[in-house]
Curated annotation (Swiss-Prot):
The keyword Transcription regulation applies. Keywords: Activator, DNA-binding, Nitrogen fixation, Plasmid, Repressor, Transcription, Transcription regulation. Gene3D superfamilies: Jelly Rolls, Winged helix-like DNA-binding domain superfamily/Winged helix DNA-binding domain. PROSITE patterns: CNMP_BINDING_3, HTH_CRP_1, HTH_CRP_2. GO terms for molecular function: DNA binding; DNA-binding transcription factor activity. This is Nitrogen fixation regulation protein FixK. Residues 134-204 form the HTH crp-type domain. The keyword DNA-binding applies. The gene is fixK. FixK is a protein that regulates nitrogen fixation genes both positively and negatively. FixK appears to repress its own expression and that of nifA. FixK may bind DNA at the FNR consensus binding site. One of its GO terms (biological process) is nitrogen fixation. Residues 163-182 bind DNA. It comes from Rhizobium meliloti (strain 1021). SUPFAM superfamilies: cAMP-binding domain-like, Winged helix' DNA-binding domain.
Length: 211
């Protein structure tokens, strides 16, 4: 299953993190890989900041397929949804530590939240453009460029998510993802250190594929 209904955080304690987009008291929770953070239909009364690890947000479609709508990396926040209940599932990809902010703190920090929400909205709009107009090579190139920028802009990229996650995010099959990665490698645009680590060999050439 993509989410276990009874999954709970492995440990929770009240403390303060280091630098964070929002100040004030928060809970800190650590989730094991694959653990559900919240489910579709759960009360929407918190927002979350990734301290370590990675999170996927997804929805299960009526035919049983999974559509991943976003990934969240250290320093990024998620959980912003309209309405009183969540419309998506959130799940830890790797062992993940989160700062969890309650509704009261969210209201007190509305200006900070607005900036974060707008950043998330811009990323979501860009993602819609990618999957709506680009071919498989362009989608994966855009995904790698975006992820690289979110990890600091260096030439080595660590993929916390699986190729199935990437396929479900980009609207592709896992076979297509593997073929495109191989094609980019053969063109010397990327090099694979292992299944989850990619060296960006020609960043400008990779970026040009996104246009």
């Amino acid at each position: 299953m993509y989410a276990a209904a009874q999954a709970k955080p492995q440990s929770i304690e009240v403390e303060h993190l280091g630098p964070a987009p929002m100040s004030g008291p928060r809970l800190v929770a650590t989730y094991k890989p694959g653990r559900e953070i919240y489910a579709q239909g759960d009360l929407n009364d918190k927002c979350y900041q990734v301290s370590t690890g990675a999170v996927r947000i997804y929805r299960l479609l009526s035919d049983g397929r999974r559509q991943v709508v976003s990934f969240h990396l250290p320093g990024e926040m998620f959980g912003f949804e309209a309405g009183s209940n969540h419309s998506f599932f959130a799940e830890a990809i790797t062992e993940t530590t989160l700062a969890i902010f309650g509704r009261r703190n969210m209201q007190e920090r509305s200006r900070e939240l607005l900036a974060l929400a707008l950043t998330g909205m811009a990323r979501a709009q860009q993602h819609l453009l990618v999957i709506g107009r680009q071919c498989a090579v362009e989608r994966i190139a855009a995904f790698l460029v975006d992820l690289c920028e979110r990890q600091g802009g260096g030439r080595q990229l660590r993929l916390p998510m699986s190729r199935q996650d990437i396929a479900d995010y980009l609207g592709l099959t896992i076979e297509t993802v593997s073929r495109v990665v191989t094609k980019l490698k053969e063109r010397s645009l990327i090099a694979l250190r292992d299944a989850r680590t990619i060296d960006i060999m020609k960043p400008e050439a990779l970026r040009s594929l996104c246009n």
